[in-house]
């Protein structure tokens, strides 16, 4: 994979910008903002998608597939770290000496000079960002924003606003969250992840200390998460903590998780009851952090509570795709044991007497090797049956011996897990197990959501009908 130079000097003018992998959730949102700012935008992606079509309608010229000719007369290239070094567009740009910007560099360049709210953390970034944006709009504010997922009720992951206020989901996975000139920083947690990039837990913590220390106005940070507490102890300036911890500046109590979550927030001696439209204890925690940011931005506390109640979720966060013969099919972006636990606990609060059939696609070979046992323990505790697919490698080369079988082999009861690298077999198995009232939940930040049409088709197939041919995953 490529390693963009995050320290490079960016030209004052970028001219025509070419995005490689423009259909991705983060890239498409940034491309939308470049279009809104009047830039000529071109791009390429491995496949067509709704995001690609939406950008075309806004004026972007987008090619399906990768070819050096697609670069055309571009003045700069925008990429992610999940790009192979032999990508022909990247190779040509290097040969021409074009500026090659990481997506976060491009965004930081575009929004320079604005008051910036940056949301970081190993888990909960996308949801927390969506909550802040939704509540600001409900309160009559008009920020610009870019999120890692489509925000429910808005139908987009990014949009320009009329205020000099920008809300961004900041990606810590490769250190690029340190590029922003942050005014208000929200740190949801500092649960060690991405150690393939950082190398150690200490280096991971250090990055968050740098991120928080750079915030010019306010740091909002969890008081429940041990990693966040380590960071808090090392930073100065205005800090507001949130959580169930009795010492938190904004304390969460009386959480009710039977269906959409409800809870009490106590701040400056005043307690307010809050309710959300999304399930899960973790979303009460996310909402508390968002509330702290909103109040820090000058939103009236009661308006902040009302605005959070309008949040209806984000794409790929416990997202319902279909209900077939009484079986609900959900997708969730969870790709770390902590996130999987939160997603399955949320599912458990709404499934009632039904069962949870989890379809897990391990993400990254390094994470699978390091956390296979942790994943297995969470799934065995909270899912009634788990189907494990093979590893989605993303930016990594395969590691010998590391497959999805590592996860399934860690289950204490082999009767509650299947390792099925063939996607059609996995879809058929999920449909075979499921009965009226059950949930089938796909979990990964890879492309596991693309198995959902196969799952739906398997659920709709009459008993005894011929099975489709095997397939490792849907074709591009």
UniProtKB/Swiss-Prot annotation:
GO biological process, one term: regulation of cell shape
Main location per the UniProt record: cytoplasm
Organism, as annotated: Clavibacter michiganensis subsp. michiganensis (strain NCPPB 382)
Compartments where found: Cytoplasm
EC number: 6.3.2.8
Listed GO CC annotations: cytoplasm
Intrachain disulfide bonds: none
Pathway(s) per entry: Cell wall biogenesis; peptidoglycan biosynthesis
Catalytic reactions of this protein: UDP-N-acetyl-alpha-D-muramate + L-alanine + ATP = UDP-N-acetyl-alpha-D-muramoyl-L-alanine + ADP + phosphate + H(+)
Organism domain of life: Bacteria
Function: Cell wall formation.
Record protein name field: UDP-N-acetylmuramate--L-alanine ligase
Keyword Lyase applies: no
NCBIfam families: murC (TIGR01082)
């Amino acid at each position: 994979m490529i390693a963009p130079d995050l320290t490079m000097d960016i030209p004052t003018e970028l001219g025509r910008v070419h995005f490689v992998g423009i259909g991705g959730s983060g890239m498409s949102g940034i491309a939308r903002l470049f279009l809104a700012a009047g830039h000529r935008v071109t791009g390429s992606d491995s496949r067509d998608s709704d995001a690609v079509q939406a950008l075309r309608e806004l004026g972007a010229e987008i090619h399906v597939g990768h070819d050096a000719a697609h670069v055309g007369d571009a003045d700069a290239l925008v990429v992610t770290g999940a790009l192979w070094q032999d990508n022909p567009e990247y190779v040509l740009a290097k040969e021409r000496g074009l500026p090659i910007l990481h997506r976060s560099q491009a965004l930081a360049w575009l929004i320079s000079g604005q008051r910036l709210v940056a949301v970081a953390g190993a888990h909960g970034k996308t949801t927390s960002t969506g909550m802040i944006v939704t509540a600001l709009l409900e309160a009559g504010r008009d920020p610009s924003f870019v999120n890692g997922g489509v925000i429910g009720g808005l139908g987009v992951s990014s949009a320009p606003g009329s205020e000099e206020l920008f809300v961004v989901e900041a990606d810590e996975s490769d250190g690029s969250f340190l590029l922003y000139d942050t005014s208000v920083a929200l740190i949801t947690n500092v649960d060690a992840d991405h150690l393939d990039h950082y190398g150690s837990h200490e280096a991971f913590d250090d990055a968050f200390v740098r991120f928080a220390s750079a915030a010019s106005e306010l740091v909002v940070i969890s008081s429940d998460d041990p990693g966040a507490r380590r960071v808090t102890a090392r930073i100065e300036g205005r800090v507001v903590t949130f959580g169930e911890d009795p010492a938190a500046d904004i304390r969460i109590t009386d959480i009710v998780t039977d269906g959409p979550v409800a809870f009490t927030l106590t701040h400056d001696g005043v307690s307010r009851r809050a309710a959300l439209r999304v399930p899960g204890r973790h979303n009460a925690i996310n909402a508390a952090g968002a509330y702290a940011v909103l109040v820090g931005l000058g939103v009236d506390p009661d308006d902040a509570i009302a605005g959070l109640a309008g949040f209806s979720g984000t794409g790929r966060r416990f997202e319902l795709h279909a209900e077939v013969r009484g079986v609900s099919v959900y997708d969730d972006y969870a790709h770390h044991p902590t996130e999987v636990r939160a997603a399955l606990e949320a599912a458990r609060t709404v499934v009632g007497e039904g069962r949870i059939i989890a379809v897990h696609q391990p993400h990254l070979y390094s994470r699978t090797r390091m956390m296979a046992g942790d994943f297995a323990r969470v799934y065995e505790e909270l899912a009634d049956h788990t189907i494990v697919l093979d590893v989605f490698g993303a930016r990594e080369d395969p590691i010998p011996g590391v497959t999805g079988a590592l996860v399934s082999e860690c289950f204490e009861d082999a009767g509650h897990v299947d390792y099925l690298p063939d996607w059609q077999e996995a879809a058929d198995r999920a449909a075979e197990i499921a009965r009226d009232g059950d949930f089938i939940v796909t979990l990964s930040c890879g492309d596991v959501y693309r198995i959902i049409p196969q799952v739906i088709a398997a659920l709709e197939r009459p008993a005894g009908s011929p099975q489709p041919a095997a397939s490792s995953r849907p074709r591009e």
